[in-house]
């Protein structure tokens, strides 16, 4: 499979198309001028580690385990993404409450499936385990909400890769019988019901081979 250039979408790692930083800034300009709200997501198909600083991870272990390291531009810490995990991002010219609406929707969705879900300190937990992390980063007049939902979380790999101690222990939703396809459908349903992206449809940046 041809490796494609990385497109950092408010901390959302994409391998969808070749773009430059200038092209990305052009997209941000369109939002400022048009007041657009954009949402994107992807399903991870190759292991990747998103880092704010490379010093946060053991690069040799990443290479040994087959994880690519990609530097992000948000203020989140290191996140180890396994195949099947969901990454998503939303950005807008002004803070529009998307962050809180998504949290409420996803927690309710998990509870409807009988799971002990709660939101605390930028994370969604199930039985005390972290299954979703979010952060909001402000660049000038643009608000970025970036997040991930763990599906096939590999705790042994995370412990080996990350140099910083974990504040919360992660767990994949596959341990509760939930699949990537179900989470993808949930995310699209939320975006459709939320109605915050009338100017631009939700974009799926999956790989092409």
Describe each PLM feature range.
Residues 53, 90-94, 151:
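Short beta-strand-to-loop capping motifs
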């Amino acid at each position: 499979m041809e490796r494609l250039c990385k497109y950092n979408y408010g901390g959302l790692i994409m391998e969808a198309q070749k773009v430059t930083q200038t092209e990305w800034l052009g997209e941000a300009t369109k939002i400022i001028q048009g007041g657009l709200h954009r949402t994107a997501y992807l399903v991870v198909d190759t292991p990747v580690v998103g880092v704010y600083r490379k010093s946060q991870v053991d690069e040799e272990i990443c290479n040994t385990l087959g994880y690519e390291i990609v530097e992000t531009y948000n203020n989140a810490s290191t996140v180890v993404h396994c195949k099947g995990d969901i990454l998503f991002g939303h950005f807008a010219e002004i803070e529009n409450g998307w962050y809180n609406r998504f949290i409420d929707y996803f927690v309710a969705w998990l509870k409807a499936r009988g799971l002990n879900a709660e939101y605390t300190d930028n994370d969604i937990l199930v039985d005390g385990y972290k299954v979703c992390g979010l952060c909001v980063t402000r660049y000038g007049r643009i608000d970025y909400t970036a997040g991930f939902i763990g599906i096939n979380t590999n705790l042994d790999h995370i412990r080996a890769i990350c140099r910083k101690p974990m504040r919360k222990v992660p767990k994949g939703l596959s341990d509760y019988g939930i699949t990537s396809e179900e989470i993808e459908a949930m995310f699209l349903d939320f975006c459709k019901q939320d109605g915050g992206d009338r100017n631009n449809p939700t974009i799926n940046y999956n790989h092409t081979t």
